[in-house]
Amino acid sequence: MKNITDPFPCLGYWPSAGSFGFNTDILATNPINLSIVIGVLIFFGKGVLSDLLDNRKQRILRTIRNSEELREGAIEQLEKAQARLKKVETEADRFRVNGYSEIEREKLNLINSIYTTLEQLENYKNETIHFEQQRAINQVRQRVLQQALQGALGTLNSCLNNELHFRTIAANIGMFGAMKEKNN
């Protein structure tokens, strides 16, 4: 059988580590070197780390301040918006009340104007009816008078002869002459 370390030839050349235990040789364990490196890192790294932490702290504080300012601005804008909303609601209520009263007033004015117009139309109708009645009565009177005159003229023409006609004219002339003398 082959040796297990054959595929890893480098492992065969390493010496084995020995047992676990404390090495009391200070220079062999490098605690001094490690403490020096750690001390140098703490001494010089403390400033860099402190600067990084201070920068981070300043950024966080600046962000908090900006957030507070934004919050205060948002609260102020909210209060202004609420005040404007209340004002607009008040105006809307006033317009609504005034609008309703204006609508009622316009409605009453319209109703009154319609009644006035209806009364005027009724008066015009009555006047037109009265005028038409008077015209019809006048036409009937004229017609009756015309027929009466035609009838009287027909009667007179049939009854009168020249002698009666001359006597009537003479009598009328005599009456006019007497009236003329009285007036003088």
Swiss-Prot record:
Q: Which domain of life is it from?
A: Eukaryota
Residues spanning the membrane? 27-49
- A Pfam family of this chain: ATP-synt_B
Q: Which UniProt keywords apply?
A: ATP synthesis, ATP-binding, CF(0), Chloroplast, Hydrogen ion transport, Ion transport, Membrane, Nucleotide-binding, Plastid, Thylakoid, Transmembrane, Transmembrane helix, Transport
Topology of this chain in the membrane: Single-pass membrane protein
First and last residue of the signal peptide: none
Q: How does it assemble?
A: F-type ATPases have 2 components, F(1) - the catalytic core - and F(0) - the membrane proton channel. F(1) has five subunits: alpha(3), beta(3), gamma(1), delta(1), epsilon(1). F(0) has four main subunits: a(1), b(1), b'(1) and c(10-14). The alpha and beta chains form an alternating ring which encloses part of the gamma chain. F(1) is attached to F(0) by a central stalk formed by the gamma and epsilon chains, while a peripheral stalk is formed by the delta, b and b' chains.
What the protein does comes down to: F(1)F(0) ATP synthase produces ATP from ADP in the presence of a proton or sodium gradient. F-type ATPases consist of two structural domains, F(1) containing the extramembraneous catalytic core and F(0) containing the membrane proton channel, linked together by a central stalk and a peripheral stalk. During catalysis, ATP synthesis in the catalytic domain of F(1) is coupled via a rotary mechanism of the central stalk subunits to proton translocation.
Against PANTHER family, the record matches this protein to: ATP SYNTHASE SUBUNIT B, CHLOROPLASTIC
Query: Extra notes?
Result: In plastids the F-type ATPase is also known as CF(1)CF(0).
User: What does the similarity note say?
Assistant: Belongs to the ATPase B chain family.
Q: What is this protein called?
A: ATP synthase subunit b, chloroplastic
What's the source species for this entry?
Answer: Lotus japonicus
Classification of source organism: Eukaryota, Viridiplantae, Streptophyta, Embryophyta, Tracheophyta
